[in-house]
């Protein structure tokens, strides 16, 4: 007997409570592939499911990459480095599978069925995010492809957000937060990152009095994250000076810096 849409959503919530995120993904993927537009609750459940599944692997990748860098600096550690490299590749395979999975659902079902500006921004932001996650560990042509796809998705989301969502909308703010992280961490463009983050923050501040009570907490939280990133980035830029681009490239390839805050849709 096939599981109903209502049951799949309930099982996804149950899996979330049990912290069984792979099963949460499977249940929400079933709902997302139905061809019907998702409700706000359903799309948030989908986002949370994939975010937890990939978030664990991204954290693992950063830790293993850091250990790899330390071992490479030691003498007589060639065998250990080979083991670490193999283990890192295993994590990268998992990251690729998860990202390709949600990107396929987005392109085949969610984006084509989206009818509101809010849902379109939400899904194009997700598309930008998961291509960005691929770019984090890829190299060569694969990295260039993921970077370009991420940039295109973020730009599309931004164009829609600018015309259809107010500056204080949490999804528009979350998009600005993640798009600025893309500029800083993937494209090594701190100036673009800071400009985008500051513009989003300033635009939201200017219309803070129009903020609805229901989204006040979510919006102000993301605004704080934007400000935190600006503080972190401007500090890094002043310390690094002319060596910024080279340093950022080395950090990406070897050891990840303290991660900038990213924004997710409120539940």
UniProtKB/Swiss-Prot annotation:
Q: Does the keyword Phosphoprotein apply?
A: yes
Q: Where is this cross-link: Glycyl lysine isopeptide (Lys-Gly) (interchain with G-Cter in ubiquitin)?
A: 76
Site (NTH1 binding): residue numbering on this chain: 136, 185
What ranges does the record give for the region Disordered, renumbered to this chain? 236-267
* Pfam families (UniProt xref): 14-3-3
Under SUPFAM superfamilies, the record lists:
14-3-3 protein
Task: State the source organism's domain of life.
Answer: Eukaryota
Sites bearing N-acetylserine, chain numbering: 2
Q: Name one GO cellular component term.
A: nucleus
Sorted keywords for this record are: Acetylation, Isopeptide bond, Phosphoprotein, Ubl conjugation
Q: Which GO terms describe its biological process?
A: aggresome assembly; ascospore formation; chitin biosynthetic process; DNA damage checkpoint signaling; mitotic spindle orientation checkpoint signaling; negative regulation of apoptotic process; negative regulation of protein ubiquitination; negative regulation of transcription by RNA polymerase II
Q: Where is the composition biased (Low complexity)?
A: 243-267
Phosphoserine modified-residue sites:
89
For this UniProt entry, the molecular function terms from Gene Ontology, in alphabetical order, are: DNA replication origin binding; enzyme activator activity; phosphoserine residue binding; RNA polymerase II-specific DNA-binding transcription factor binding
- UniProt keyword Transport present: no
The extra comment attached to this record reads: Present with 158000 molecules/cell in log phase SD medium.
PANTHER family membership: 14-3-3 PROTEIN
Assembly and oligomerization:
Homodimer. Interacts with NTH1 (via N-terminus when phosphorylated by PKA); the interaction is direct and activates NTH1. Interacts with FIN1.
Role description:
Involved in growth regulation.
The family line of this record is: Belongs to the 14-3-3 family.
What is the official name of this protein in its record? Answer: Protein BMH1
Species of provenance: Saccharomyces cerevisiae (strain ATCC 204508 / S288c)
Gene responsible for this protein: BMH1
